[in-house]
Amino acid sequence: MIAHLINTDLYGRNIIRLYLEYRERDFDFLSNATSLFLENVDRVLIVSCFPIPPMQIAETDGPPGALALYRTVEKLGGKAEVLTCKKIQKALKDFKIDFAQTPSIENYSLLISVETPGRAKDGNYYSMSALEIEVSPFDELFLKARELGIPTIGIGDGGNEIGMGNIRDLVCKHIKFGEKIGSVVKVDSLIISAVSNWGAYGLIAQASIEVGKNMIKSWSKEEEKVLKALVSSGVIDGVTKKPELSVDGIPLEVHKSFLTLLNSIVENKIG
């Protein structure tokens, strides 16, 4: 049910077709990612930042989900750090986050990407509209982690993010400009969702059910605070390209309703 909910395609980007075919290959992808997450929460590096062309300004999708995962790792007794761009760091400076600067991959038990660009087959990075974007090559950390056998989780919603290399053929089939923008970077466990923040929240909700403790319950109020802080610092909605209280063209109130429904599912499952 949670996997269906996080793939509610409100703005028709074909993620639902991608999701349905992906689920035929890996029916339990969310449960599998949750198991990997819960088994490796000792020291987690969470990566998030997606610049939107032409101004290359970071978007509101990704950082809220990254922060929610950061808080969840803390609740589970682990330690997390967030690797992101300077604009996001500045926006979230008052949220008591440990930001990684030059992380050594060997020090982490798990890497998670939430809406972070992954290189395409030509080595460049692209937006959903196939415009080239300027990024810090955070995906190199995931390539190295895979070489070292360090677990990796990728969360994405468009085909051009870290982890979408797992299903690049489906991205080419279902996503506009997929052949050009589709990431080749693979992860151990991939979560796809209609909004990447929702994918992160879905992971937290599934983890809550597994451990019998609701760790998503308070996030609705926190998300609003985070989004306001991001927008106040000039972070933009990736669809409207404006600094407003929305994510991927979806107003804050809809995201709050989504979290309310997700919370209800968790409460019903854990009693």
Annotate the PLM regions.
Residues 1-43:
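Positively charged, low-complexity intrinsically disordered leader regions
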Residues 21, 46-64, 194:
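Short, glycine-rich nucleotide/cofactor-binding loops
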